[in-house]
Structures are given as structure tokens and as C-alpha cells.
Design a protein with these regions (language model features):
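Extended, low-polarity transmembrane helix blocks
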Residues: 1-114, 121-379
Length: 379
């Protein structure tokens, strides 16, 4: 049984250093993360992704989804602005799905529930993760019309680049890499610039070295353990935020006050009133809002490249994602009866979590009870 915080049970001398406050193994412990030093694991991200798919599947069972109008309206909106050949394919798919809406919707809803359940069960998680990538990309292209990127007025505030694309990016980011020994998902080190090198240990703590003590692996994230590696995952984050910032250059994106106000359409009266109030705050300030908003998005994207600014950039990204998800999208319009997902806000925040650098303590906790000498984590 895991007992609380192992730092309170094991004297620092057990790790080869003086028993001094704030130190482990003679080295100063890094500052705890913004969620209180709790573990951020690949499996935790995978489970969260599974919960999101379950939510999407549940939303797909809403009565309005089983009607012809749902497919005609949704795919008709997705078709706006698409290039000619793609638009033709989208139109043909709309006709096919609208012919038997109840059957197709039941299949889609069941598939999303199955993906979510599969991600929650370890034995099927890898297969479900792979299938979720294919389905998410299909939804992004067909159901969201490539995230609405060809339609004027699409930006971060209204849901760009599309929740489905972010589902796929997260799934690819946490896809387990194969260690040199052949074990899928085994811990690997990127220390010293050699991906796949075995993780060093000292004093029973993974990532410790004979000279540096605990913390040699600190700063690594869930993405670092994935098949893409942390560096490529961070560039993907940069591309997402640069892309949304570029969308602010469109003239149709220069009316944020109106976009915030119209978010309330179809919402209950109280929610719509809040949307109108938020939109009213920025009336007459559209251009300054767009400039500052675009600058913040660029800063969030660039900030992850430097270790020193990575945490602040990711924290700012989470704040922006949740703010736009709530004020700009009403969490995908969950209360309208027509929502298919909770919007891009929660998913973009989850992407940030996969990139969040762990502390040395988080690395030791991630390694499990065996990492602590004398079995201090177990009783």
C-alpha cells in the first residue's frame, strides 16, 4: 500500500546526502509543479483521453443526433469554404449519412464509447489508442471540415484548430516507444542526447547519478517517453499556437466582441446572458484584443522551446485554452443539446499536461516503490 509522501518517511541520508529541509540526496529539490507535485503519467493522460471519448460518445446519443437535420446541418457547416474536390466528397458523404441518420449515428456513438472504454482498460488501451487516431482524423476532416480552417472567422476563440485534431495529436504524442530491449513502453532516457539509452540509477532512485543525486531526469515530460520524443511534441505545440495566431490575421476574426456574444445562441438564458456580458466588455476594443490575443498565442508557442520558460508558457497555454473554451465556446455548447464534444479548451489543456516537465520527486514517484531504497513506499 502506498503511504503518503515518501519524502516524509525516508531521511535524506538514505539517498547519500545530509538530512536537510528542502534537499534530497544533498541536492536541492526542484519546485513542486503547479498541481501540487502530483504525478503526471502517460497512463494518466491515456485515461483522461478515454474519459473524453466517453463524454463524446454520450453526447452522440442525444436525441437530436439521430435526425437527418443533424447530419445536414453539421456537415453542411463543415463543407463551407472547402476546396472543390473535397467539397464534392463531403456533399456525397452528407447524402449517404442523411439517408439513414439513426443507424449511422448509433454506430458512431457506439464506436466512441468503445474507444473510451478501450483506453480505460490496460489490455486494450494500445489498440484503442491507435484506432482513436484514425477516427479523430476522420472526424476532423469530415465532421469538422478540417477544423473549419477554410471558413472565415475560425480562430482559437471559436474552436480552432478543432478538438478532433488535438485528440489525434495527444494520442500520437503518448504512443509508447520501444526501448532498446524490445519492451514496449519501457522507461527510456533521453539524457545526454541519446534516445533509448538505459535509465541510470544511483542509490535506488532512477535518474540519479553518482555525482548529481536525484534529479538527472527531472524536466522530462510524458511526451519525452513517447515515440515522437519531447522535442518533436513541443514543435507540434508551437505549430498549433502559431497556426491559431495566424488565423487572427483574417478580417473575419477582427470582431471578437461579436463572436463572444453569439456564443450564447441556443444556450439557456443565464448562460446566454453571461456570453452577452463578456462580449459587451470588448465592444469597441476589437483591434487591441486581437493584437494582444495573437501576441499571447505566439508567446505560448515559442515559450515551450526553452527549458526556463517552458512551465510559464504551458501554464499560460492552459489558461488561454480554458478561457476560450469557456467564454468563446461554452465548452462546445454542452447545454444546447447539439454538442458533439466539450470543445478544444479541455483537450488543449491536456496537450499541455503531456509536455509539463516533471520534478525530480515526480520522476522518483513515477518509477514506483522500487525506486526508493528499503521499500519506503510500500508496507
Amino acid at each position: 500500500m502506498v503511504i503518503g509522501d515518501w519524502r516524509k518517511q525516508v531521511p535524506a541520508s538514505r539517498f547519500g546526502g545530509a538530512d536537510r529541509p528542502g534537499r534530497i540526496g544533498g541536492a536541492r529539490e526542484p519546485t513542486a509543479s503547479w498541481w501540487g507535485g502530483r504525478r503526471v503519467t502517460r497512463r494518466g493522460v491515456e485515461i483522461t483521453l478515454g474519459v473524453l471519448w466517453l463524454v463524446d460518445g454520450a453526447l452522440q446519443f442525444q436525441p437530436s443526433m439521430f435526425t437527418r437535420g443533424f447530419f445536414v446541418d453539421m456537415l453542411g457547416m463543415a463543407n463551407m469554404g472547402l476546396p472543390g474536390p473535397v467539397s464534392t466528397v463531403e456533399y456525397d458523404l452528407t447524402s449517404m449519412l442523411a439517408a439513414h441518420p439513426a443507424l449511422w449515428n448509433a454506430l458512431f456513438a457506439a464506436l466512441q464509447v468503445a474507444l473510451g472504454a478501450g483506453l480505460l482498460w490496460r489490455r486494450t488501451a494500445r489498440a484503442a489508442l491507435g484506432l482513436s487516431i484514425l477516427w479523430a482524423l476522420s472526424v476532423w476532416i469530415v465532421g469538422e471540415g478540417v477544423g473549419g480552417l477554410f471558413m472565415g472567422g475560425t480562430n482559437l476563440l471559436t474552436g480552432a484548430p478543432g478538438a478532433a485534431l488535438l485528440y489525434a495529436l495527444i494520442a500520437v504524442t503518448i504512443w509508447p516507444r520501444r526501448a532498446s530491449g524490445g519492451a514496449l513502453g519501457a522507461p527510456v532516457s533521453t539524457g545526454g542526447g541519446v534516445p533509448g539509452a538505459p535509465v541510470s540509477t544511483h542509490g535506488g532512485v532512477p535518474g540519479a547519478s553518482a555525482s548529481g543525486g536525484v534529479g538527472a531526469r527531472a524536466g522530462r515530460s510524458v511526451a519525452d517517453e513517447g515515440v515522437l520524443g519531447g522535442a518533436l511534441a513541443r514543435w507540434m505545440w508551437l505549430l498549433v499556437w502559431f497556426g491559431t495566431a495566424a488565423l487572427e490575421l483574417e478580417p473575419a476574426s477582427h470582431t471578437p466582441a461579436a463572436q463572444l456574444t453569439t456564443t450564447g445562441e441556443g444556450e439557456p438564458g443565464a448562460v446566454a446572458a453571461v456570453n452577452h456580458a463578456i462580449g459587451g466588455l470588448f465592444t469597441g476594443w476589437d483591434l487591441p484584443f486581437v493584437v494582444v490575443f495573437a501576441f499571447l498565442q505566439v508567446a505560448v508557442g515559442v515559450g515551450v522551446l526553452a527549458p526556463r520558460t517552458r512551465r510559464p508558457a504551458l501554464a499560460a497555454g492552459v489558461a488561454l485554452a480554458l478561457a476560450t473554451g469557456l467564454a468563446g465556446q461554452d465548452l462546445g455548447g454542452l447545454l444546447t443539446g447539439n454538442a458533439t464534444d466539450p470543445g478544444t479548451g479541455p483537450v488543449l489543456a491536456l496537450f499541455a499536461v503531456t509536455l509539463w516537465p516533471r520534478t525530480a520527486v515526480g520522476e522518483a514517484l513515477e518509477a514506483g516503490p522500487a525506486a526508493v531504497p528499503g521499500g519506503a513506499l510500500a508496507r
